[in-house]
Amino acid sequence: MSPECAQTTGPGPSRTPDQVNRTHFPFFSDVKGDHRLVLSVLETTVLGLIFVVSLLGNVCALVLVVRRRRRGATVSLVLNLFCADLLFTSAIPLVLVVRWTEAWLLGPVVCHLLFYVMTMSGSVTILTLAAVSLERMVCIVRLRRGLSGPGRRTQAALLAFIWGYSALAALPLCILFRVVPQRLPGGDQEIPICTLDWPNRIGEISWDVFFVTLNFLVPGLVIVISYSKILQITKASRKRLTLSLAYSESHQIRVSQQDYRLFRTLFLLMVSFFIMWSPIIITILLILIQNFRQDLVIWPSLFFWVVAFTFANSALNPILYNMSLFRSEWRKIFCCFFFPEKGAIFTETSIRRNDLSVIST
């Protein structure tokens, strides 16, 4: 072991012979060979584009939602979703640094925090989507019974639970990710890598099963059940729409259309999440299986592109949300920028439209 690698590992608990002799998965560290420059430029271009789109999209979505000055539970959860996306994509610059340097040169502290923050923010995202679907279902049931929605304390407690549980569930990654020296395929010497170093196989298997079940499968089941129930209620309500005497007919249709738009948007967010997060969940399970099947090879480059695909979800979420619910606002911004005369007209009409709530509370 070179002195540099020995210093990089830093102080920590003593490692068992099994941990020392084990070949660890290098995650973002990789030896790219002769095409290193071309591959690094391609990776930087893709992740850089995702980072810019995600940053602008989520910030604009936050501003547009806050400007409506609504304080419902759905609004709080949607804002929480955008914040989680911003936190998740904040890891992109660090990932690019590792892809350029190949070896891990960011130190042990960043090694502990990088994957922890990524996992925690991903957990917050799916739990928030599950909470949104559950809140929508409960809200519809409450409205049918003439009851009010959850108060601010309940909303704050729900957000605190989502972040607190996600932080605790991902805590083993913060503890067990460490910098170790390892010789990678294609390399001629050991280099420091940031990897997950479990003390035993049982703990690794237990945590993987626990995390995938409680942070992916269970929220997914909640989402499916909630939206199925919402769909049933929506169909039944539309059949009775013309028979209701509580509101005028035009108001009933307007509310129904708004609820349907919100339902469709949140459903798209849910579908996109499962499509774009399923590959990384499967890859993590394959990395676990790789410990027992040495003939199963998972290249770090494959892991990178799977993570890049997952990063893209954070850029897609605000696009889906904005295009579905804020078309008029984006049209106004476009016209104000390119056609100032038309922008004034959109500004006047948007003031009247702001009185209508896109997100029912």
Swiss-Prot record:
The record's annotation in PROSITE patterns points to: G_PROTEIN_RECEP_F1_2 (PS50262)
- Superkingdom to which the source organism belongs: Eukaryota
Query: What are the start and end residues of every segment in region (Disordered)?
Result: 1-21
Keyword Glycoprotein among UniProt keywords: yes
Q: Phosphothreonine occurs at which residues? A: T347, T349
Q: Which cysteine pairs are covalently linked by disulfides here?
A: C111-C194
For this UniProt entry, the molecular function terms from Gene Ontology, in alphabetical order, are:
arrestin family protein binding; fatty acid binding; G protein-coupled receptor activity; taste receptor activity
Mark the transmembrane ranges. 46-66, 78-98, 104-124, 157-177, 205-225, 269-289, 296-316
Which Gene Ontology cellular component terms are annotated? Answer: ciliary basal body; ciliary membrane; cilium; endocytic vesicle; endosome membrane; lysosomal membrane; plasma membrane
Which positions does the record annotate as the modified residue Phosphoserine?
S350, S357, S360
Which keywords does the record carry? Cell membrane, Cell projection, Differentiation, Disulfide bond, Endosome, G-protein coupled receptor, Glycoprotein, Inflammatory response, Lipid-binding, Lysosome, Membrane, Phosphoprotein, Receptor, Transducer, Transmembrane, Transmembrane helix
One protein family per Pfam: 7tm_1
One of the GO biological process terms = positive regulation of brown fat cell differentiation
According to its record, how does it sit in the membrane? Multi-pass membrane protein
Q: Record's CDD domains?
A: 7tm_classA_rhodopsin-like (cd00637)
**Chief site of localization:** membrane
Q: What residues bear carbohydrate chains?
A: N21
> PTM per UniProt?
Phosphorylated at two clusters of Ser and Thr residues located in the intracellular C-terminus. Prerequisite for FFAR4 internalization via an ARRB2-dependent pathway.
* Alphabetized InterPro entries for the sequence: GPCR_Rhodpsn, GPCR_Rhodpsn_7TM
Q: Kindly report every residue range on the membrane side named Cytoplasmic.
A: 67-77, 125-156, 226-268, 317-361
Provide the family line.
Belongs to the G-protein coupled receptor 1 family.
Q: Which purpose does this protein serve, as stated in its record?
A: G-protein-coupled receptor for long-chain fatty acids (LCFAs) with a major role in adipogenesis, energy metabolism and inflammation. Signals via G-protein and beta-arrestin pathways. LCFAs sensing initiates activation of phosphoinositidase C-linked G proteins GNAQ and GNA11 (G(q)/G(11)), inducing a variety of cellular responses via second messenger pathways such as intracellular calcium mobilization, modulation of cyclic adenosine monophosphate (cAMP) production, and mitogen-activated protein kinases (MAPKs).
Subunit info?
A: Interacts (via C-terminus) with ARRB2 following LCFAs stimulation.
Could you tell me what this protein is called? Free fatty acid receptor 4
- Native source species: Rattus norvegicus
